[in-house]
């Protein structure tokens, strides 16, 4: 994912910053404790498409 897109995208729940995790193909919102999937290069920024981040993931 290109940095210019990360600068534009925000969490739809908190409007906060997102972190790109290339290994999992996800965008993480630590504030919302959600991970939004990226499928075929397209981020799915819907709350019902996101998965909850575990406490271990949040500490990493």
Swiss-Prot record:
Coiled-coil regions listed in the entry: none
Family: Belongs to the UPF0434 family.
Any one Gene Ontology cellular component term annotated for this protein: cytosol
Name used for this protein in its record: UPF0434 protein NMA0874
Pfam families documented for this protein: Trm112p
Top-level taxon of the source organism: Bacteria
InterPro entries: Trm112-like (IPR005651)
Organism of provenance: Neisseria meningitidis serogroup A / serotype 4A (strain DSM 15465 / Z2491)
